[in-house]
Amino acid sequence: MTIQKNWQELIRPNKLQVTPGSDATRFATLVAEPLERGFGQTLGNALRRVLLSSLQGAAVQSVHIDGVLHEFSSIAGVREDVTDIVLNIKDISLKMQGEGPKRMVVKKQGPGAVTAGDIQTVGDIVVLNPDLQLCTLDDGAEIRMEFTVNTGKGYVAAERNRPEDAPIGLIPVDSLYSPVRKVSYKVENTREGQILDYDKLTMTVETNGAISPEDAVAFAARILQDQLNVFVNFEEPRKEVTQEIIPDLAFNPAFLKKVDELELSVRSANCLKNDNIVYIGDLVQKSEAEMLRTPNFGRKSLNEIKEVLAQMGLHLGMEVPGWPPENIDELAKRFEDHY
């Protein structure tokens, strides 16, 4: 028995089905089936834990409020105590490219509410929930707050955000860095052929908008993959290379390459899978208009695919005589190492 049988003969999901929610940037349901019995619970639990604990994000680390020495103060003309303001600041959702720490400021006069949308951001910081109310000002009141923003993972308590040389008036804030807000999963029975006891894993993921749910799951899976590599203590035996006759084709053999081997974003790859576009030969025959009619497929994904095809000397809207060949799966396997 070859060692490869330990993993090669296990059933694997045909594809990951992604169903976006009302806001595709924040909500999605992902389904993987069929899985070996017990794998639904194993993978669902592992992915959920990593999603909630280990993805990088941005959050407010501390705040300085003009005229305030500590968080147990009150501010003239401001209806909320500083403690309540700090709790509201903790709920600010941010997206930031690059590394921190960075600064952002809010300055406003009353009367009226001060919201996260009033914050003056710099560089690559984006406030994802601008309607979040931070405090309420009476007529004639004024407030100025300066925030320190940083990147990290998981949850960091305010005490850990206080530097040893913190100046008077610096108020540390609990930081929720994780871009993932909620994750739930369920495991159901599913069938494959005549076998009824395989697993179907359904995951529901909600993010703060800094990352899409499908990308979040992809990153979590990559983290698990990287952590598990240390347990693999062997190298797979190399396949024996046999000389075979390669038939002449009426089309570019690169068309036999599967689209899931292209370096595409998770969203673009899933759109192609959901539209049953398996091979590059299927893809290049599509026009731009046809691609844009694909559900959840936008201009950004279109430009990404056009760029990848251009690097191969290909483009959309090509005519491919003799496509698809009758024995496409066999041909694709034979040409796998030749392009």
From Swiss-Prot:
Give a GO cellular-component term: DNA-directed RNA polymerase complex
GO-annotated biological processes: DNA-templated transcription
Q: Which gene encodes it?
A: rpoA
Anything noted about its domains?
The N-terminal domain is essential for RNAP assembly and basal transcription, whereas the C-terminal domain is involved in interaction with transcriptional regulators and with upstream promoter elements.
Q: Which UniProt keywords apply?
A: DNA-directed RNA polymerase, Nucleotidyltransferase, Transcription, Transferase
Q: Which reaction does it catalyse?
A: RNA(n) + a ribonucleoside 5'-triphosphate = RNA(n+1) + diphosphate
Q: What family classification does the UniProt entry report for this protein?
A: Belongs to the RNA polymerase alpha chain family.
Keyword Transmembrane helix in the entry? The reply is: no
Q: Which residues cross the membrane?
A: none
Alphabetized InterPro entries for the sequence: DNA-dir_RNA_pol_insert, DNA-dir_RNA_pol_RpoA/D/Rpb3, DNA-dir_RpoA, RBP11-like, RNAP_asu_C, RNApol_insert_sf
Q: What is the stated purpose of this protein? A: DNA-dependent RNA polymerase catalyzes the transcription of DNA into RNA using the four ribonucleoside triphosphates as substrates.
The protein depicted here goes by the name DNA-directed RNA polymerase subunit alpha
- Asked if the keyword Lipid metabolism belongs to this entry, the reply reads no
Q: Where is this region: Alpha C-terminal domain (alpha-CTD)?
A: 251-339
Q: What is its EC number?
A: 2.7.7.6
Location of region: Alpha N-terminal domain (alpha-NTD) = 1-235
Q: Where would one find coiled-coil regions in this protein?
A: none
Single GO molecular function: DNA-directed RNA polymerase activity
How it assembles, according to the record, is: Homodimer. The RNAP catalytic core consists of 2 alpha, 1 beta, 1 beta' and 1 omega subunit. When a sigma factor is associated with the core the holoenzyme is formed, which can initiate transcription.
Which NCBIfam families does the record associate with it? PRK05182.1-2, PRK05182.2-5, rpoA
